[in-house]
Amino acid sequence: MASITLKDLVKSYGDTEVLHHIDGEINDGEFIVIVGPSGCGKSTLLRMIAGLETVTSGDIKICDRVVNDLEPANRDIAMVFQNYALYPHMSVRENMGYGLKIRGNSKADINRRVEEAAEILEIGQYLDRKPRQLSGGQRQRVAMGRAIVRDPQVFLFDEPLSNLDAKLRVQMRLEIRKLQQRLGVTSIYVTHDQVEAMTLGDRLMVLNGGYVEQFGTPIELYDRPATLFVAGFIGSPSMNFLPAEIDAGMVTLENGARLAGGGSAAGKVTLGLRPEHLVADDNGPVEVNVQLCEQLGAITLLHGHLNGTDTECVASMPGHVTAAPGTLMRFSIAPENLHMFDPQTGKRVAE
């Protein structure tokens, strides 16, 4: 097992810098998820750690050893890809053991490791099948098995569930998490799916445009997002953002409604309200002109606008709720659930 250090890491292609001074400490045995939208640099960062991309400047350390110039084969890592990367003419057993065979391991050692990994992943009955005879989830287990037999210091996962349907993704992400906890191997996982990130990671590194927006636990990112980007990216449905002004511990919305909160902050802010924190209240200060009810079974999402404005607002209510278009509904929100951001910098305002 291994700790990993990213120190002032920069990646450029020609004159274009795509990763900007990335810093991060990953502890031994930790499961880290790098999450962000398409094109943010998350897969590039993972490939740099793997040794598949060169480092422009900065250092990558594995177990306190700088590995910038080490070949991938010498970094003691194993990678699981989105497209499985299985050899179609080989059996599952041969696919899982092929890397060990190339490294010169004995046949007995290869068979032992493959059998152990197959037992962990519950694919022992498929060892003599070809990949074409397997489902997508089974193929992904084989790809993970190929990584496990290596007995590496670090697992790297590059969006391994993207090709699976929604139900199977939920099942497989739970299996990956249980597997990582069982093996205790330091793991880095890349995804664009914030729900996947929240359920898998001990900590999340949120990337945006090649910059680290925030690096913390899922709960830290949910409860105290450091920037507008993190606030809007983490959580489903997304946080509501309303123009507001703070004065003397009161928050005034653009339609004149006033909410208690804001602490010692003052001036114009972007106010963030999570839909699930809006509580139906006939005397509440937040009045929403409902345009659409989205029935999801356990909850109902009410989509509309802050009354008297064009600012969109979504409320999440438990159970089954119906409201005709144009219905005015009032909501209250606890002061501790208000999030305030500087409208110029996008950074969280000190409370």
Swiss-Prot record:
Chain sites annotated for binding ATP: 36-43
Function: Part of the ABC transporter complex UgpBAEC involved in sn-glycerol-3-phosphate (G3P) import. Responsible for energy coupling to the transport system.
Domain of life (superkingdom): Bacteria
Family designation: Belongs to the ABC transporter superfamily. sn-glycerol-3-phosphate importer (TC 3.A.1.1.3) family.
Subunit structure: The complex is composed of two ATP-binding proteins (UgpC), two transmembrane proteins (UgpA and UgpE) and a solute-binding protein (UgpB).
Protein name, UniProt field: sn-glycerol-3-phosphate import ATP-binding protein UgpC
PROSITE patterns the UniProt entry points to: ABC_TRANSPORTER_1 (PS00211), ABC_TRANSPORTER_2 (PS50893), UGPC (PS51315)
Gene expressing this chain: ugpC
Species of provenance: Ruegeria sp. (strain TM1040) (Silicibacter sp.)
InterPro entries: AAA+_ATPase (IPR003593), ABC_transporter-like_ATP-bd (IPR003439), ABC_transporter-like_CS (IPR017871), ABC_transpr_MalK-like (IPR015855), ABC_transpr_MalK/UgpC-like (IPR047641), Mo/tungstate-bd_C_term_dom (IPR008995), NA-bd_OB-fold (IPR012340), OB_MalK-like (IPR040582)
